[in-house]
C-alpha cells in the first residue's frame, strides 16, 4: 500500500467513525489484592456476639479460635455461625505441644490433644489446626536437639502426623505444621518433602517466615526466601503468622531476635504482595504482650499494604 492509498483509506475510516460512532470499550479496573488480618482479643467475651464485636472493634477480619477443646457442640456451632455471619474467618486452632517426646505418657497425651484440636478445627470450620512437629529435646518441648533433623525423626513426624489426620479425616480444615529453625519443616523444600511423605489431603502448610530466617544470608535476603515459599507452597498455605526479626549488631556471632512487626527487617512488602494473591488466607499477629503493641503492629502492616495497593 502506497502512502496515498493509506491516506485515502484512513480518511474513509474516519468518515465511517464520524457517521457511525463506535462504542467506547472500557476495561474493568483490576481488583485490588485483599488480606484478612487478625490477632488475639484482650477483651473478655461471654458469647458469640460479644466476640464478634471485639473482633470488629480491632478492625480484624480474621480471628484465632474463640473456644477450646472443652467447648460443647452448641458453643462450637454458635461461634461458627457467628463468624460466618460477620464475615470473619477463624484462622487456626493452636495445639503447641510435643508429639514426638520420648516420654511415652506425654507423647500419648500430646497426640490425643492434636486429634481433639483437629476435630475442633473441623467442626468450627477453622482454616487449620496448627502445631510444631516437636523436638527430641528433653528439657524444652520445642527446643533444638542434634536428632531433630535426622531421618529417624523425619519418619516419626510423618507417622504421627498421619495418625492424627487419619483419626479425624477432616473435611472442613487441614492439619498443619509450623516451621521451626531446628525442626521439620524448616524451609520450603523440607515442607514439600513432608507433604509428599505424609501423603494426606488433610495436611497443609502454616507459614511463619520469621521462623525460617535461620542465617545472616537468609536474613539479608529474606524477601527472596518469602517469594520462594509462596512459589512452592502457595496452594498449600492455610494461615500465616505476622511478626518480625532483627539481627544483633553488637556481637560477632549470628544472633537473631523476634520483634514486633515493623521494628525488624522482614520484607513485608514482598510478604503482603504474595499473600494477597491467595484466597482468604489469614495473617495473624502473635507473641506481643499488650493490645497497644498489637495495634502498633497492625498499623504498620496496614501502612505497608496501603502503599502496595493491598486492602487489609
Which residues fall in each region the model found?
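N-terminal twin-arginine translocation
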Residues: 1-5, 16-29
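Acidic (Asp/Glu)-rich catalytic clusters
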Residues: 32, 52-57, 72-92, 119-125, ...
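Acidic/histidine-rich catalytic cores of soluble enzymes
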Residues: 93, 162-260, 265
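Hydrophobic faces of well-ordered beta-strands that scaffold small-molecule active sites
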Residues: 35-40, 63-65, 90-95, 129-131, ...
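Active-site acidic/histidine proton-transfer and metal-coordination neighborhood
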Residues: 10-12, 16-18, 49, 85, ...
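C-terminal helical cap(s) of enzyme catalytic domains, especially alpha/beta-barrels
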Residues: 294-311
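Conserved, mostly hydrophobic/aromatic
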Residues: 55, 63, 83, 110, ...
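Acidic-and-aromatic substrate-binding clefts and catalytic sites of carbohydrate-active enzymes
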Residues: 41-49, 65-76, 99-102, 137-139, ...
Amino acid at each position: 500500500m502506497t502512502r496515498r492509498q493509506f491516506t485515502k483509506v484512513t480518511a474513509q475510516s474516519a468518515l465511517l467513525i464520524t457517521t457511525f460512532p463506535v462504542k467506547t470499550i472500557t476495561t474493568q479496573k483490576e481488583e485490588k489484592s485483599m488480606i484478612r488480618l487478625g490477632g488475639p482479643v484482650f477483651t473478655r467475651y461471654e458469647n458469640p456476639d460479644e466476640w464478634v464485636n471485639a473482633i470488629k472493634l480491632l478492625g480484624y477480619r480474621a480471628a484465632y479460635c474463640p473456644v477450646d477443646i472443652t467447648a460443647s457442640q452448641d458453643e462450637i456451632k454458635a461461634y461458627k455461625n457467628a463468624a460466618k455471619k460477620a464475615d470473619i474467618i477463624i484462622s487456626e486452632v493452636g495445639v503447641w505441644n510435643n508429639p514426638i517426646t520420648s516420654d511415652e505418657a506425654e507423647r500419648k497425651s500430646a497426640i490425643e490433644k492434636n486429634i481433639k484440636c483437629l476435630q475442633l478445627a473441623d467442626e468450627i470450620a477453622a482454616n487449620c489446626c496448627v502445631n510444631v512437629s516437636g523436638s527430641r529435646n528433653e528439657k524444652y518441648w520445642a527446643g533444638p536437639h542434634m536428632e531433630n533433623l535426622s531421618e529417624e525423626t523425619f519418619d516419626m513426624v510423618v507417622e504421627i502426623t498421619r495418625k492424627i489426620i487419619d483419626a479425624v479425616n477432616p473435611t472442613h480444615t487441614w492439619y498443619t505444621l509450623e516451621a521451626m529453625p531446628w525442626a521439620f519443616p524448616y524451609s520450603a523444600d523440607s515442607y514439600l518433602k513432608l507433604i509428599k511423605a505424609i501423603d494426606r489431603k488433610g495436611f497443609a502448610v502454616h507459614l511463619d517466615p520469621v521462623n525460617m530466617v535461620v542465617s545472616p544470608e537468609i536474613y539479608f535476603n529474606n524477601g527472596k526466601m518469602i517469594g520462594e515459599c509462596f512459589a512452592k507452597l502457595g496452594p498449600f498455605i492455610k494461615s500465616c503468622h505476622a511478626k518480625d526479626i532483627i539481627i544483633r549488631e553488637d556481637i560477632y556471632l549470628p544472633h537473631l531476635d523476634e520483634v514486633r512487626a515493623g521494628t525488624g527487617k522482614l520484607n513485608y512488602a514482598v510478604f503482603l504482595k504474595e499473600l494477597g494473591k491467595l484466597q482468604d488466607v489469614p495473617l495473624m499477629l502473635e507473641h506481643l504482650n499488650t493490645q497497644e503493641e498489637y495495634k502498633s503492629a497492625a498499623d504498620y502492616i496496614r501502612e505497608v499494604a496501603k502503599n502496595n495497593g493491598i486492602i487489609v
